[in-house]
């Protein structure tokens, strides 16, 4: 049996301020730092270990992973970073307060932008100061690859490309893997692993910094999955439902 651990980064500063974040490189809040430490303690108490780790190129996911591995005394574990594990790009919504955006565009429209599978928010323009294609971390992206906005389907496409090319072969070779990433990135991966419909993923919530364990067969088909706490598996009815993309 193969085990995979997924973890959404701890609360970020913009989660705290209720702002759309996307690809903006926002750090963890004090609460987020504490959440990451607790996640590491949970994994250590439950006797987990890892051979390799994956994360995005955004500091909130990277720092969460660093803290988790530090708490587990696993700072030697190789870490692979990829923009393909970044959060969904929220286009022109990035940096905006969610409540103020709902007042401007209507709650229904904002709900569609946030939760639908195939509807993109308004796009950034290339002259927008929030356009980050010149950032050195994205220098390997080809022309047209850097998104101006994304729907969940767009996010899923790049996440699964990286899953199939990089992560799946490592898992099949028997390595223990942890992925520290983002709400919509993990939603995309869970949608694929559990073969969820578009309707099914709409209501899928990923809580911050609580380890999500997938037990997989040799073909990486899920046997079962569960969240972890200090006391072991979290009962289904006690899984936190909060979410903030």
Curated annotation (Swiss-Prot):
Amino-acid biosynthesis as UniProt keyword: no
Entry-linked PROSITE patterns: PG_MUTASE
Substrates-to-products reaction catalysed: (2R)-2-phosphoglycerate = (2R)-3-phosphoglycerate
Binding site for substrate: 8-15, 21-22, 60, 87-90, 98, 114-115, 183-184
GO BP, one annotated term: glycolytic process
Enzyme class at the top of the EC tree: isomerase
Annotated positions for site Transition state stabilizer: 182
Keywords: Gluconeogenesis, Glycolysis, Isomerase
Active site: residue positions: 9, 87
One MF term in the entry's GO annotations: phosphoglycerate mutase activity
Pathway assignment: Carbohydrate degradation; glycolysis; pyruvate from D-glyceraldehyde 3-phosphate: step 3/5
UniProt function note: Catalyzes the interconversion of 2-phosphoglycerate and 3-phosphoglycerate.
HAMAP family with a match to the protein in the record: PGAM_GpmA
Protein name: 2,3-bisphosphoglycerate-dependent phosphoglycerate mutase
Lineage: Bacteria, Bacillati, Bacillota, Bacilli, Bacillales
Gene name, Swiss-Prot/TrEMBL: gpmA
